[in-house]
Every structure is written in structure tokens, then in C-alpha cells.
Design a protein with these regions (language model features):
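Short, Lys/Arg-enriched N-terminal segments with co-localized hydrophobic residues
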Residues: 3-32
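Extreme N-terminal starter segment of soluble prokaryotic enzymes
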Residues: 34-36
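Glycine-rich phosphate-binding P-loop
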Residues: 39-52
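Short beta-strand-centered segment that lines the nucleotide-binding/catalytic pocket of NTP-utilizing
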Residues: 61-72
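ATP-dependent small-molecule kinase phosphotransfer cores
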Residues: 72-132
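Small-molecule kinase domains that catalyze NTP-dependent phosphoryl transfer to phosphate-bearing small molecules
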Residues: 92-98, 173-218
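RNA pseudouridine synthases
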Residues: 127, 140-146, 165
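Conserved phosphate-donor/acceptor-positioning beta-strand/loop module used by diverse small-molecule
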Residues: 146-169, 174-184
């Protein structure tokens, strides 16, 4: 059995220096340091920025766009296709995507979505084998669930903060960001459920869940760093 640490944090935790010390997993007398960090996140929560900061501060490799490029090389899929389908259900109809792909294992030929998922999974496992790294999204928390040297993080935020972030980052108009956020969340939920059987964003699936809207991106990054330093 692997012991997990669940932490609920509020804004009052900011500025406390070495808040957590080092995080280890102990099993049968063995001590394992958290060398691999997976960052799952709500769209617009700043998860990528947090992951990048963590990697820079710890000196870990960082895989986000880099993972997309590697999958493109090996699979032959265009990077744009991977960005759209590498962690999102089909844009046309999420429910139909789920129902259609639920029977994929009854067919000899894998769908393009399945081929992409399998390729991504293999690359994520290979990257983890290389050593200390931060991996953003793409079901990495599930793919690496049996590794005891992993810290699985979920980043969430309130709708207003997320809406402001995507307006600033992507130039989204003020009228539509909430709708875009809801659509992105739904597609991620369906994709994650389809390939993992788990509920995306459910606290029990992660070691720590942080609210970047309440804590701030920098504080979230610092907390994760303290857990692994």
C-alpha cells in the first residue's frame, strides 16, 4: 500500500517559508523521494505556469509542449491534432465520443484517439524513467499511478479568475470565456473518464489539490517545491 498525503490549503498558508519540509513515501521500510511531478489542471487555472516554475526551481525537466512534439515525431500526427485530441474528447459531441469509443476494444483496429493515447502513454513512461521531471496533463497522473516516486497535483481555480486568465493569455472576449471554460472542462472530464475510469478532478485521485485563484500561481509553485525539495 502506498500512503498518500491529502492537503487542503487556504490563503493563510502563504509566506511560511519551509512549510512542509520534504515529502517521502514509506512502504515496507523503504523511503522514496518524489522525483516526478504530474500537474493536472482546470483550463485557465495556471497549471502550466505553475508546473514550469516548479521545474525551474527544482532543476527538473519540464514536459508540456515538448511532449506534444515528441508524440508528433513518433505517431505522425500533426502537433495541432495532438493539442486538440491529446487530452480532450472529440469537439463535435463529447457524449457520442464516449459512447463510440467505449467499444473500441471489440475491434481489431484501434481508433486514432486510441493510437494517440497509447503513444502518449509510452512516451510519458519513458520520460519518467529518465528521472526528475514535471509532466503537465495528458492523464500522466493515471499513467504513472503505480510509481511511488510521483507526486500527483491537481490545480483548480474559481471561474472568475480562470476567465480573466484566458482573456489575458488568449485574447478571449469578455462575453465568451465562461462558456469556453465549461466546454474545455467537459471535454477533459469525458476524455479522462474514458481512458482511466476515474473522475477528473476528484481529490482522491491526487496527492494534493491547490486552488490557484485563492493562493496565487507563485504560492502554489512554492508549495509544490517545498514538498519535493
Amino acid at each position: 500500500m502506498c500512503y498518500t498525503i491529502s492537503i487542503r490549503l487556504s490563503k493563510t498558508c502563504q509566506g511560511r517559508g519551509n512549510l512542509f519540509g520534504r515529502l517521502y513515501v514509506k512502504e515496507r521500510g523503504e523511503t522514496v523521494m518524489k522525483n516526478i511531478i504530474t500537474i493536472s489542471r482546470e483550463f485557465g487555472s495556471g497549471g502550466r505556469s505553475i508546473g514550469k516554475q516548479v521545474a525551474e526551481k527544482l532543476g527538473y525537466a519540464f514536459y508540456d509542449r515538448e511532449l506534444v512534439d515528441e508524440v508528433a515525431k513518433r505517431s505522425g500526427f500533426a502537433p495541432e491534432y495532438i493539442e486538440e485530441h491529446g487530452e480532450y474528447a472529440n469537439a463535435r459531441n463529447s457524449l457520442l465520443f464516449y459512447l463510440a469509443t467505449a467499444e473500441r476494444y471489440s475491434h481489431d483496429n484501434l481508433s486514432m484517439h486510441d493510437q494517440l493515447y497509447i503513444t502518449q502513454s509510452k512516451i510519458i513512461e519513458e520520460l519518467a524513467e529518465k528521472g526528475k521531471c514535471v509532466i503537465v496533463g495528458r492523464c500522466a497522473d493515471y499513467i504513472l499511478r503505480d510509481r511511488k516516486d510521483c507526486l500527483h497535483v491537481f490545480i483548480c481555480s474559481d471561474m472568475a479568475s480562470r476567465a480573466r486568465r484566458i482573456v489575458e493569455r488568449y485574447g478571449q472576449t469578455q462575453k465568451a470565456p465562461e462558456k469556453r471554460l465549461a466546454e474545455k472542462d467537459q471535454k477533459r472530464k469525458v476524455y479522462y473518464k474514458n481512458y482511466t475510469g476515474r473522475v477528473w478532478g476528484q481529490a482522491q485521485n491526487y496527492d494534493i489539490c491547490l486552488n490557484s485563484g485563492a493562493l496565487g500561481v507563485d504560492t502554489c509553485a512554492d508549495m509544490i517545491v517545498q514538498l519535493c525539495k
